[in-house]
Amino acid sequence: MKDITAMVVVQIATAGLNIFFKLAMEDGMNPSVLVAYRLLFATLFMIPICFIFQRKKRPEFTCRLMLLALLSGLLGVVIPSILTITGLALTSATFTSAAGVLTPLVTFIFAALLRMESVRLGSSVGLAKVFGTLFGVGGALVFIFYRGIEIRLWSTHVNLVNQPRDSSRDATTHHISILGALLVFGGNISISLWFLLQVKISKQFGGPYWNATLMNMMGGVVAMLVALCWEHDLDEWRLGWNIRLLTIAYAAILISGMVVAVNAWCIESRGPLFVSVFSPVGLVIVALVGSFLLDETLHLGSIIGTVIIVGALYIVLWAKNKEMKSMLTTSDHNETNKTSKDITVNNLPTLSTNVP
């Protein structure tokens, strides 16, 4: 139950990140500068936490470990952040979160191809994994493309983006370009690859805090170089007490700091599919927050898609829990057999006892 609660909190935090990113982009902030500052602040925030809570787990800083941290930073932060933020400016917060539910499908396909996730189509668990993942993606597609009647949950007259509302277009699909959609999907593929990478390398970093810190540090070096090549105007690098600074602080401390560490811990304990399947929860949260703060409109398709997504989530969780129980039962059975054999061997008479 602890890991499920952790992943729900992660999705709430990630949903808030999409809202902040949208506001920062509307304020004209350069995506590469945002990512560079985010990783710099995250590294400075996480270093003392590592020495306070995981001093004894500090890994040996070899060239191989730093290269793995660089690869993790590229796949987990730099590439998805730049692609998603750039795509977000061409789409919407709700679409970006909705596209994120493709992450479980991509993760499941890659994990199955690499034999990191068992898929037995002849068993109920295997079928539940496949159909649960597909239902989740199907629910997201319904959420995006089926409009239906308009549903007003509340009327706050709040619109933080400060853009005039166009009633002729649906809020979940307006300003969505093909380029923006491709950028967002590219970011999701990068996240899926990062999930799978974490399965192989997470234990080599000593602990989730060191994992997040080294990932942010090495990714930050690359992000800073990209930002310096992309943005030469010094005014774009100046920070004030505005939405840009708030977005950077939120992304650095809560997301790149704590959320990355929690994700690494859950991937190590429950696997990449378990983590990625919670992506649809973020879609529901963004839809509700978007309708409340960004004056986005919910429709019947949003409600139907949400129901399908939640149902799919429960199907996959059921499959994962049943699989975990089966693994624990098998492990206990093997341990019992081993102990029984040891006792039998120890009770056998030795050669010396038969000698008069």
Swiss-Prot record:
Residue ranges occupied by any EamA domain in the UniProt entry = 14-142, 191-317
Cellular location(s)? Membrane
Q: How does it sit in the membrane?
A: Multi-pass membrane protein
Question: Keyword set for this entry?
Answer: Membrane, Repeat, Transmembrane, Transmembrane helix
**What is the name of this protein?**
WAT1-related protein At1g68170
The protein's matches in SUPFAM superfamilies, at most eight in alphabetical order, are given as: Multidrug resistance efflux transporter EmrE (SSF103481)
Q: Which GO terms describe its molecular function?
A: transmembrane transporter activity
Q: Which family does it belong to?
A: Belongs to the drug/metabolite transporter (DMT) superfamily. Plant drug/metabolite exporter (P-DME) (TC 2.A.7.4) family.
One Pfam family name is EamA
* Membrane-crossing segments per the record: 4-24, 33-53, 65-85, 94-114, 125-145, 176-196, 210-230, 245-265, 273-293, 298-318
Q: Which GO terms describe its cellular component?
A: membrane
